[in-house]
UniProtKB/Swiss-Prot annotation:
Family: In the N-terminal section; belongs to the methyltransferase superfamily. tRNA (mnm(5)s(2)U34)-methyltransferase family.
The protein's required cofactors: FAD
NCBIfam families hit by this protein: MnmC_Cterm, PRK01747.1-1, PRK01747.1-2, PRK01747.1-3, PRK01747.1-5, tRNA_MNMC2
GO CC annotation: cytoplasm
Annotated function: Catalyzes the last two steps in the biosynthesis of 5-methylaminomethyl-2-thiouridine (mnm(5)s(2)U) at the wobble position (U34) in tRNA. Catalyzes the FAD-dependent demodification of cmnm(5)s(2)U34 to nm(5)s(2)U34, followed by the transfer of a methyl group from S-adenosyl-L-methionine to nm(5)s(2)U34, to form mnm(5)s(2)U34.
A GO molecular function held by the record: tRNA (5-methylaminomethyl-2-thiouridylate)(34)-methyltransferase activity
Segments of this protein annotated with the region tRNA (mnm(5)s(2)U34)-methyltransferase: 1-245
A Pfam short name: DAO
EC number per UniProt: 2.1.1.61, 1.5.-.-
Protein name: tRNA 5-methylaminomethyl-2-thiouridine biosynthesis bifunctional protein MnmC
Organism: Serratia proteamaculans (strain 568)
Length: 673
């Protein structure tokens, strides 16, 4: 997907106080009464909220073209909140709203527009508090304590739709076909859009739009909708409403070798692990109503790679606009929203959103940073900074310029993990510590978990979140992941080091002082293939030496004192392409057998079977050294997959996270795995 910068909306305000788009010379909503127009056209036109009471599933999914001021979304949110308050035990428990916006509004303009509707203020305030940066792609916002999911896709809807993942097929219960009038914005109202709407609509799904233009009606009908004219709002004579026939056929998966199956049973899910990925996955599943059990091999959570005192949080950028960059930029913004939400829920952990500075300390690092900055990033995400600027930001002179991440910072992974699990337990999570799963055996009803001394346990669905120990269980032993030992040094602060105000990244990292223990963290060693966790003096010294080597002209690094031998070692799990593995556990032997002629089948357009995987066995792993950045979005992706929901990412990103990706890439090229 293109990484072209997103242009924000340019507004003027007419005599009625209605916002007008300068790009399209059209109002965002009716001068007469925008709120009532929304209720009439989009809610009543889709028989909402009356359909909520009869909805047979826990989730109702709405998609919209043209988010604008968010009026349609806020109005629907209000209606859903009223429904939930009066009918708390209904089958329907959550609302998922998907919307596209080519020119997102600035927060200040949103606030001015929202001031028109005081009754929507509680919802509008919460929306603006999470309003994302203008970055292309999907921004998932979790609102109303998780009952509302908002996917904001920034970019041109017709450019985004071809990159959508098949998880959207036959999902949408109601379409809000909105946007500026066809006469003002003809590029949006295309046959491609109408076809995608039909492809994504659930059989029996509805649509409504304010326009009655003939080419729109014909285009929707040609795409497969049954469309009729209805009385328009106010002085408008007509509008269109419609439905996709209940017998609409299923949509074929365009890339079956990347199929992401849902779980057959979400009422009984076991997670094997005890780190940050386990904690956040448990919360994502519980939010959806799952029953979840955690099995941790250690006496308490966060004894492994998630047990450090301070970990840096910042995006991984490269300037290439590839899946790696797209994932980590989206993951970083989602992580900040999630961590802020957890803090508001009472999940405490040491942290400072103090910013992160990455140094151009040599020719190679300067080249990498130059590539990153070739992209026009929002300045709140990443910005170039010369030596003087970085020195002012960091409070200490490094001797170099580089790139600054204003919304980055550090947090305590151990406290985050343990306290997030405590919150999950309050929400119903069952935890079993010192429960080391030694074997997984498929049964007719799911999976049998075997331990050394405990009785076996049965669960319908299992998630592997056991870090570098993935290879110890037979179904996942073939996954191409590897262990990386890392030792982090804990050093006492000094008057000079205490001046450091941001996380400093070079060929290593140094954190600001943690006021609660008067120590910094400096690290980390990188020993591929090693799983031993004993203290090593040579790695302790190397952590210090790398700082001195990268900042040779500065005197303050010499104050770093590692002589106390205070350190912690963890073992990460990583992949060659630096991306996590999120999804169903692939069956290695079945993949080789079933796809031995995949290249030829694909080239000839032959039917290709779905990717073979172990039923109801999933993995979230290989988070490497950036688990604090990737774990929240990874957990959300996996939970959405298990529940068969739309996923927060485009097809290229999701393909790059699929656990079978490395095998399939080779097989598609006719190469041996």
């Amino acid at each position: 997907m293109s990484h072209a910068p997103i242009q924000t909306a340019a507004l003027s305000w007419n005599e009625q106080g209605t916002p007008v788009s300068k790009q399209f010379d059209d109002v965002y909503f009716s001068n007469q009464d925008g709120l009532e127009e929304t209720r009439y056209v989009f809610l009543k036109g889709n028989r909402l909220p009356s359909r909520f009471a009869e909805h047979p599933r826990p989730l109702f999914i709405v998609a919209e073209t043209g988010f604008g001021t968010g009026l349609n979304f806020l109005t629907l949110w209000q209606a859903f909140a009223d429904f939930h308050a009066t009918t708390p035990d209904a089958t329907l428990q959550r609302l998922h709203f998907i919307s596209f916006e080519k020119f997102p509004l600035l927060q200040a303009d949103l606030a001015a527009a929202h001031a028109r509707w005081p009754e929507l203020a509680p919802y509008a305030d919460e929306l603006r508090a999470q309003w994302p940066l203008p970055l292309p792609g999907c921004h998932r916002l979790l609102l109303a304590e998780g009952r509302i999911t908002l996917d904001l896709w920034f970019g041109d809807v017709n450019e985004l739709l071809p990159h959508f993942d098949a998880s959207m097929h036959r999902q949408i219960d109601a379409w809000f076909l909105d946007g500026f009038a066809p006469s003002k914005n003809p590029d949006m109202w295309t046959e491609q859009l109408f076809a995608a709407m039909a492809r994504f609509a659930r059989p029996g799904g509805s649509l409504a739009t304010f326009t009655a233009a003939g080419f729109v009606r014909r285009g929707l009908q040609q795409a497969g909708f049954e469309v009729i004219k209805s009385k328009g709002f106010g002085q408008k004579r007509e509008m269109l409403i419609g439905e996709l026939p209940a017998d609409a056929p299923a949509v074929a998966h365009p890339t079956p070798w990347l199929l992401r199956p849902a779980a057959d049973n979400t009422d009984d899910i076991a997670i094997i692990g005890g780190g940050v990925a386990s904690a956040l996955t448990a919360l994502a599943l519980l939010r959806r109503g799952a029953k979840v059990t955690l099995y941790c091999a250690d006496p308490q959570a966060a004894e492994g790679a998630s047990g450090n005192r301070q970990g840096a949080l910042y995006p991984l950028l490269n300037g290439r606009g590839d899946a790696l960059e797209n994932f980590f930029s989206a993951a970083f913004l989602f992580a900040r929203r999630q961590y802020d939400a957890l803090l508001k829920q009472g999940v405490t952990f040491d942290h400072q959103w103090c910013g992160v500075s990455q140094l151009a300390y040599d020719e190679k690092s300067a080249g990498k940073i130059a590539n990153m900055l070739a992209v026009e990033w929002p300045q709140q995400l990443a910005v170039a900074a010369d030596r003087t600027t970085l020195s002012a930001l960091c409070g200490i002179d490094s001797g170099f310029g580089g790139i600054n991440y204003p919304q980055g910072g550090w947090l305590c992974p151990a406290e985050l993990t343990r306290n997030a699990i405590a919150l999950a337990q309050h929400q119903g999570l069952s935890c079993h510590y010192e429960s080391d799963v030694k074997a997984l055996t498929a049964t007719d009803s799911g999976w049998q978990l075997s331990f050394n001394q405990e009785e076996t346990r049965q669960h319908a669905t299992v998630i592997l979140a056991n870090g570098h120990r993935l290879g110890e269980l037979a179904p996942s032993e073939a996954l191409p992941v590897y262990a990386v030992r890392g030792q982090v040094s804990h050093i006492p602060t000094t008057p000079a080091l205490s001046e450091l105000k941001q996380v400093l990244c070079y060929d290593g990292y140094l954190t600001p002082v943690n006021a609660n223990n008067q120590q910094h963290c400096i690290g980390a060693s990188y020993q591929r293939g090693e799983t031993a966790t004993e203290y090593r003096e040579e790695e302790q010294q190397d952590n210090r030496a790398r700082l001195l080597r990268c900042l040779p002209e500065q005197s303050w690094p010499a104050q770093v004192d590692v002589s106390g031998q205070h350190a912690r070692c963890g073992v990460r799990s990583a992949t060659r392409d630096h991306l996590p593995m999120i999804g169903a556990v692939p069956d290695y032997q079945a993949t080789l057998t079933q796809y031995q002629h995949l290249q030829r089948q694909h080239q000839r357009g032959e039917a290709i079977a779905n990717a073979p995987s172990y039923p109801n066995l999933f993995v979230i792993g290989a988070l490497g050294s950036r688990g604090l950045c990737s774990a929240p979005l990874a957990a959300e992706i996996l939970a959405a997959q298990l529940f068969g929901e739309p996923l927060p990412g485009d097809a290229d990103m999701l393909a790059a996270l699929n656990p079978n990706r490395m095998w399939v890439r080779k097989l598609l090229k006719g190469r041996a795995v």
